[in-house]
């Protein structure tokens, strides 16, 4: 529910009262259709597995708003992310790998706009190289990687953070792809998780940022060749993350000329006014 409040310094401002959280799980959905090994873990797609897990865990946190979970994929018209659908979305979860370049820039633009207005964005695993993640962070987002069926130990370094609720000191995934530092991202607002891999590398595997009015969470695990999204700890992290990332406000910024709050005194001098009127299309 959105409660709109008059405000002289913004075109449109809303306080979000969370009665339900609308989530879209976006997946390029390529590997599952092309690779038997991946399809064995995710017969209906990674997006379907994540969506099902979110629905099952939705009521496990006392007082948490219920979830409305839907999915979208690359091959749908407008990648399933129309303006109308994004306008209703509170949190967008993004998984991509081999088809980053196929995502239309116009869709990236509208996702960016919604994050800046307040929509939450959760980027998973190889989504670190997606257009939208690199756009929001403004860096290359590169890292080291290795596929060697390694154990990953994920340490909870901020146990009081809402995304870490219900987890122990650490949890382990028996097989995962290694990601290693340096992870070329801006300094995060918070580092919630730190991963250690069997080969010796470490990686900042749970990071948060704020961009505009929206919250962003990057979560490292999730290589398509492994059943990572069936893991209960991973599912708990995602369930916590959607509650954390859900918008608190929804603000469409338009750089308006603001009327004075107080009566202005008459001035004895006159200056030339050089003003350029800008509309939303100019921003």
Label each region the model flagged.
Residues 35, 39-130, 282:
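Helical hinge/lid and interdomain linker segments adjacent to catalytic or ligand-binding clefts
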């Amino acid at each position: 529910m959105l409660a709109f409040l008059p405000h002289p310094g913004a075109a449109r401002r809303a306080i979000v009262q969370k009665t339900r959280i609308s989530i879209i799980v976006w997946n390029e959905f390529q590997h599952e259709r092309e690779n038997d090994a991946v399809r064995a873990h995710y017969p209906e797609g990674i997006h379907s597995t994540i969506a099902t897990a979110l629905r099952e865990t939705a009521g496990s946190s006392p007082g948490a708003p219920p979830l409305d979970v839907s999915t979208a994929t690359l091959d749908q018209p407008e990648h399933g992310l129309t303006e109308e659908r994004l306008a209703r979305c509170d949190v967008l979860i993004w998984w991509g790998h081999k088809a980053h370049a196929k995502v239309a820039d116009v869709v990236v633009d509208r996702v960016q706009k919604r994050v800046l207005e307040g929509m939450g964005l959760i980027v998973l695993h190889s989504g670190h190289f997606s257009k939208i993640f690199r756009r929001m962070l403004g860096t290359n987002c590169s890292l080291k990687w290795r596929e060697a069926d390694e154990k990953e130990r994920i340490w909870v370094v901020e146990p009081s953070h809402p995304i870490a609720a219900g987890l122990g000191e650490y949890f382990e995934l028996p097989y995962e792809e290694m990601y290693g530092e340096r992870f070329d991202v801006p300094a995060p607002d918070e580092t919630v998780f730190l991963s250690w891999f069997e080969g010796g590398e470490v990686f900042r595997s749970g990071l948060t940022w704020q961009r505009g009015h929206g919250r962003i969470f990057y979560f490292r695990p999730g290589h398509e060749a492994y059943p990572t999204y069936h893991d209960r700890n991973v599912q708990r992290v995602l369930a916590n993350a959607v509650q954390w990332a859900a918008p608190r406000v929804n603000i469409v910024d338009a750089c308006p000329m603001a009327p004075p709050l107080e009566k202005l005194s008459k001035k004895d001098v006159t200056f030339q006014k050089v003003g350029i009127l800008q509309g939303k299309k100019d921003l």
